[in-house]
């Protein structure tokens, strides 16, 4: 049960605007949240969605796969609950949630992940996620340095599957090559773990995933700011009224 979950907090101080600040303040790593059998079921479903996307059976913005592979440039994404841009798109839409697009609903197996994380005291019942992005990485794929858009509330959370990697943080993250970055602090992401991002680590410094050494899947959950949600969005009743188990 949830008593087996271990929570770890982090500290790494950097001088920012003349003050030494813990840039990892707010981050929590919860290990042993999802069992090996749960991980297998989730990963199988992720690749089922990938196959649907490749067959053209998912909406255009829901499924995205770069046509040409280049180290540090390729990553398959599947978005549910909302779709958002990382940068300006070809239609001139700015970074953030695209409000006029019809969104794909969060699948049942993914909703069960959210329910479990709230029940097990990993996520707060006051900020239940209502969107997610699935990332499928092949060897060398990465996520460049960024701060999550403020169309989404804090905290966000990310879960790791298939292979482990590190997430890198820093007030001065540097790109030193395709998929290669230099920062001042890193946090390991064990399989089946949940990293909760909030506080200084979510808003004050950037983070990134350097080029991964082997195939990996991650699922990142976020709660939309109500004022930024897609037009016509309706709360999912399966994610309403969730409460943690009593300790």
Regions found by a protein language model. Give the residues of each.
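Non-heme Fe(II) oxygenase metal-center motifs and adjacent flexible, charged/small-residue loops
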Residues: 1-247
């Amino acid at each position: 049960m949830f008593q087996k979950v271990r929570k770890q907090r982090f500290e790494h101080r950097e001088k920012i605007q003349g003050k030494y600040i813990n840039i990892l303040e707010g981050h929590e790593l919860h290990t042993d949240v999802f069992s090996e059998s749960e991980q297998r079921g989730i990963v199988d479903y992720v690749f089922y969605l990938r196959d649907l996307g490749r067959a053209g059976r998912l909406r255009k913005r829901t499924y995205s796969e770069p046509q040409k592979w280049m180290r540090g440039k390729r990553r398959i994404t599947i978005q549910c609950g909302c779709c958002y841009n990382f940068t300006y798109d070809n239609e001139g839409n700015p970074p953030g949630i695209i409000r006029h697009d019809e969104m794909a609903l969060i699948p049942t197996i993914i909703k069960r992940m959210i329910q479990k994380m709230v029940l097990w005291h990993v996520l707060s019942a006051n900020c239940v996620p209502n969107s997610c992005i699935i990332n499928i990485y092949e060897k060398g794929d990465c996520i460049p340095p960024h701060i999550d858009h403020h169309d989404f509330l804090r905290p966000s959370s990310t879960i790791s599957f298939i292979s482990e990697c590190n997430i890198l943080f820093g007030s001065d993250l540097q790109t030193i090559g395709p998929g290669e970055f230099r920062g001042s602090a890193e946090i390991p992401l064990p399989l089946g773990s949940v990293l909760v991002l909030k506080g200084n680590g979510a808003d004050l410094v950037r983070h990134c995933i350097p080029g991964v050494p082997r195939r990996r899947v991650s699922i990142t959950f976020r709660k939309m700011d109500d004022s930024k949600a897609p037009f016509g969005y309706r709360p999912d009743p399966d994610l309403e009224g969730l409460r943690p188990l009593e300790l």
